[in-house]
Amino acid sequence: MEKSKRSFLPWGMVSTILTLAWPTMLEELMQTAVQYIDTAMVGAIGTQATAAVGATSTVNWLIGSTVAAIGVGFLSFVSQACGAGDTKRAGKASSQTVLAVLVCGTFFTVLMLALSSKVPVWMQVDPAIQDLAAQYFFILYTPMLARAAITIFGTLLRSAGDAKTPMRVGFLVNGVNVVLNFLLIYPTRQVWGMTVFGAGWGVIGAAVASAISFVIGGVCITVVLWRHPLLSPKGQKLRPDWDVLKPCLRVALPNALQRFGTSLGYVAFASMINSLGEIATAAHTIANTVESAFYIPGYGMQTAAATLAGNALGAGDNRRVKELGRMILFIEVSLMIVSGSLLFLFAPNMMRLFSRDAQVIALGVTVLRMVAVSEPFYGVSIIVEGMMQGMGNTMMPFVCSIAGMWGVRIVGTFICTQLLGMGLVSAWACMIAHNLLLFLLFAGYYISGKWNPMNRKNAVQTVKTAD
């Protein structure tokens, strides 16, 4: 017992947080680095190629985040079961994730392939690149089953405290992607005096490279899960277990609606930006890619926050929850101040990595420096949301996120760009206002203590004692 208490003293907790967070951060860093490489490789072909790849990226977020929401339901269930020491209950969740992968993967494969030719039109993509964007989109969604496996099985492993395996699979996926990009995007050419084979497929080559790497990653993480000592679904019946699915769905459904609603907002946001022309679309696409690297500390810490909060709730340890909140928020804000400062200082250098167009670079630098200032505030909302996910409270984040996205970002951007004829800078100003609103809502809810079910339980017990 004393050993357990010592391990959750502040510096012991820092070690625990970082042990869970660093593999996710490293995985995100690798993934973002590959996005950078992808964008740079495609950008070398020309601005049209960059726009074709980036024009449908928000739809990718929409689908990817909806699948990820299913994983959040299992994360809450398994992390709480592990915190309570109930390994049997945690193991039962594994076969249900297999069902989730099969259902989600098959559904989104059929849906997205059927809609691939229509998505660029709905996104107001320039008619000159609509066919190319549609082909890219079709190829990217062919291996959706494998993509669902990477997302959901990866979340399952993290919730049991294994963040390194998803990281290794992510490294493999991204490494294969880079190598295949090099071989498939460009034609056969001379590199350092040597003839290097190239398929010369351009944007299509980038899509094929991504699809193949997803298949490899999906197979690998499935094999790892089948061999896992605690979570292997081997020997379990592949049928719905409602004792597991009901609590998972109670958490997953609001989170799925939140992600779907906010991602649909991203689609509407990007659609309005696409209507501003090729320069604005390219600058927005590249700036988004650059910005994503500087959110890595935030989302890495969110994974640790969700897992540890779920563990603490499962163990019934309210002191640990409070200590976790104080410590992880301090670490998060510190990291986001550093990352925001770096983004502000090096915005021109980052934009020049991906574009040679002076207009695209200048516009991208402006919006990146604007958003850099808001990063520490956004970091607070990321962490509080993560802790609430681990606790199984996903309704409040749903309400806050939808209100911010549609009430501030979308309405504001529509007024600025579509009615007043303003440009990309005004759209990003609306995005920053959205992030600041999230900070106020999540920080206020955290301070109130209502997000923690153990606080509510203690309050009820106090009232009963007084009676």
Question: What are the roles of these predicted feature ranges?
Answer:
Residues 8-40, 44-45, 58-73, 77, ...:
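N-terminal transmembrane alpha-helices
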